[in-house]
Amino acid sequence: MNNDVFPNKFKAALAAKQVQIGCWSALSNPISTEVLGLAGFDWLVLDGEHAPNDISTFIPQLMALKGSASAPVVRVPTNEPVIIKRLLDIGFYNFLIPFVETKEEAEQAVASTRYPPEGIRGVSVSHRANMFGTVADYFAQSNKNITILVQIESQQGVDNVDAIAATEGVDGIFVGPSDLAAALGHLGNASHPDVQKAIQHIFNRASAHGKPSGILAPVEADARRYLAWGATFVAVGSDLGVFRSATQKLADTFKK
């Protein structure tokens, strides 16, 4: 049986430096995720760090995205091999790894997603990702179809951006603007010049190593500025933010 994920089109688009517009998914239910999958975004982040997601909520959301053109990207709660292995086995191929500060941490993330000898991923012969053992070439294809995006959101990460970006197997560098702002002493103010300078520096260094860069930017002016700076995969909003904003506007329309 064929696996419709191979080849990984999102990974190929990033490698070709094609702009990929995405959205954050934090509501953690299959219906809202299915709606996002019909909206036309290139990629969607299913958040396992700050949203109430786990294996039991991720599986129905992956099912809801079956047939969608939007590539599911999972943000893992932490850079931990067992967590990553379980998410691989349920069918994720694109990973966003938070709070990467060193080359060694980037290498660990890559190794966690690769079968030996390239990595340390544990082997199960029957799971959702290989359609329960029916994808004949799964083991041959898996390693080269995994996307690893590492998130820089600390001063140490900024300092080590060259080493991180140069890490083999890292497909892109993603900026966490809120945590980066906090780390630089500007909690709640990602628009501060110090933070913006750091963001542009990260983009530039990623590009110097031939790696695409991305960011979450729910404000249109910010998103367009980052695209102008060379970011190629930008999440321009979140389901939670859109839902809150739209419902508040609707209520205000009739109550004010």
From Swiss-Prot:
Substrate binds at residues 151, 178-179. The record marks 75 as: Transition state stabilizer. Mg(2+) binds at residues 153, 179. Gene3D superfamilies: Phosphoenolpyruvate-binding domains. Belongs to the HpcH/HpaI aldolase family. KDGluc aldolase subfamily. It holds the Pfam family HpcH_HpaI. GO terms for molecular function: 2-dehydro-3-deoxyglucarate aldolase activity; magnesium ion binding. Its cofactor is Mg(2+). Keywords: Lyase, Magnesium, Metal-binding. InterPro entries: Aldolase/citrate-lyase_domain (IPR005000), GarL (IPR017648), HpcH-HpaI_aldolase (IPR050251), Pyrv/PenolPyrv_kinase-like_dom (IPR015813), Pyrv_kinase-like_dom_sf (IPR040442). It catalyses: 5-dehydro-4-deoxy-D-glucarate = 2-hydroxy-3-oxopropanoate + pyruvate; 2-dehydro-3-deoxy-D-glucarate = 2-hydroxy-3-oxopropanoate + pyruvate. This is 5-keto-4-deoxy-D-glucarate aldolase. The keyword Metal-binding applies. Pathway: Carbohydrate acid metabolism; galactarate degradation; D-glycerate from galactarate: step 2/3. Binds 1 Mg(2+) ion per subunit. Catalyzes the reversible retro-aldol cleavage of both 5-keto-4-deoxy-D-glucarate and 2-keto-3-deoxy-D-glucarate to pyruvate and tartronic semialdehyde.
